[in-house]
Curated annotation (Swiss-Prot):
Residues 180-339 form the PCI domain. It comes from the Eukaryota. Belongs to the eIF-3 subunit M family. GO terms for cellular component: eukaryotic 43S preinitiation complex; eukaryotic 48S preinitiation complex; eukaryotic translation initiation factor 3 complex; eukaryotic translation initiation factor 3 complex, eIF3m. GO terms for biological process: cytoplasmic translational initiation; formation of cytoplasmic translation initiation complex. GO terms for molecular function: translation initiation factor activity; translation initiation factor binding. Keywords: Cytoplasm, Initiation factor, Protein biosynthesis. Component of the eukaryotic translation initiation factor 3 (eIF-3) complex, which is involved in protein synthesis of a specialized repertoire of mRNAs and, together with other initiation factors, stimulates binding of mRNA and methionyl-tRNAi to the 40S ribosome. The eIF-3 complex specifically targets and initiates translation of a subset of mRNAs involved in cell proliferation. This is Eukaryotic translation initiation factor 3 subunit M. The gene is EIF3M.
């Protein structure tokens, strides 16, 4: 069957065409337009529009784009409820069927709206949900700078801002974008104030667990500065985070022995925690010592003599530590190690290093000038 193109006709005729088409597909809708006006027609059309989603993609996109075009010409105060209704239909249709089509329709709606229209928030959230259901987050703009701009442009309330960032975080995690997800969660937690930080307990808890679980995350000190995380001080989750921030392996082992059920309840695997704490402990040792004996490593990291070389190789692969093995003297020679924490002492060290470089460059400059004068 040929589907009407819905162009070059009045809005009223377009609505009537849509009504007739939907009724022909089995929808319970009158073919006559409502006396209440276009927004009432659209409300009734959107209510039953999912019947046409059974058709082939080309036909559906034509019909649904017609609905979108009519939505976009409505006054802003009449758009919001209708757009929310349409988004709900597209998100929930048949438990995730035809995601690419629904993504395209939502994208057409999103990009067809004025950039500062607040209801774009609803459409963007719907895009994220559909993208998550089919692992297609790469087709949705998720850059944090862009999301920040939208939050400002749409003048979102605090609750909506938190809802958006929380949803974005969940979607990124589901789609295996752990690095980006971590940045979004830090953004979310950083948006709380002293007054409402207590409301972010669940988010802060999830943030800590996700960071500890992530095999590619090794630095955690920035989390301690977040107000919602500070609110957890005195709780086991905060104690555990503090261990991963600056303590040694022996401290984690003691914590685990006393709180095994708690670790298990978080969904954290003890052996993975041990592996990460061994690396973190080694990083701390490498910052303080340029040479570390095998015996010291065996004792501090609780590993056997035969495991030292394999451990060092794995540590170097993380790029958190740069070192080489001296088999003859049974030691590890460190060239560089990332600091687990970066506070006043580290800033002073950086200042001293840069100042030394500056002085050396001045000496080179003066030497070159003296040579040019001779």
């Amino acid at each position: 069957m040929s589907v009407p193109a819905f162009i070059d006709i009045t809005e009223e005729d377009q609505a009537a065409e849509l009504r007739a088409y939907l009724k022909s597909k089995g929808a319970e809708i009158s073919e006559e337009n409502s006396e209440g006006g276009l927004h009432v027609d659209l409300a009734q059309i959107i209510e039953v529009c999912d019947v046409c989603l059974k058709e082939d993609d080309k036909d559906v996109e034509s019909v649904m784009n017609s609905v979108v075009s009519l939505l976009l010409i409505l006054e802003p105060d009449k758009q919001e409820a209708l757009i929310e209704s349409l988004c709900e239909k597209l998100v929930k249709f048949r438990e995730g069927e035809r995601p690419s089509l629904r993504l395209q329709l939502l994208s057409n709606l999103f990009h067809g709206m004025d950039k500062n229209t607040p209801v774009r928030y609803t459409v963007y959230c719907s895009l994220l949900k559909v993208a998550s259901s089919c692992g297609a987050i790469q087709y949705i703009p998720t850059e944090l700078d862009q999301v920040r701009k939208w939050i400002s442009d749409w003048n979102l309330s605090t609750d909506k801002k938190h809802t958006l960032l929380r949803l974005l975080y969940d979607v990124l995690v589901d789609c295996k974008k752990s690095d980006t997800a971590a940045k979004v969660m830090v953004e979310l937690l950083g948006s709380y104030t002293e007054d409402n930080a207590s409301q972010a307990r669940v988010d802060a808890h999830r943030c800590i667990v996700r960071a500890l679980k992530d095999p590619n995350t090794f630095l955690f000190d920035h989390l301690l500065a977040l107000k919602p995380v500070k609110f957890l001080e005195g709780e086991l989750i905060h104690d555990l985070l503090t261990i991963f921030v600056s303590a040694k392996l022996v401290s984690y082992v003691k914590f685990y022995q006393n709180n095994k059920d708690f670790i298990d309840s978080l969904g954290l695997l003890h052996e993975q925690n041990m592996a990460k704490m061994r690396l973190l402990t080694f990083m701390g040792m490498a910052v303080e010592n340029k040479e570390i004996s095998f015996d010291t490593m065996q004792q501090e990291l609780q590993i056997g003599a035969d495991d030292v070389e394999a451990f060092v190789i794995d540590a170097v692969k993380t790029k958190m530590v740069y070192c080489k093995i001296d088999q003859t003297q049974r030691k590890v020679v460190v060239s560089h190690s990332t600091h687990r924490t970066f506070g006043k002492q580290q800033w002073q060290q950086l200042y001293d290093t840069l100042n030394t470089w500056k002085q050396n460059l001045n000496q080179v400059k003066n030497s070159l000038l003296s040579l040019s004068d001779t």
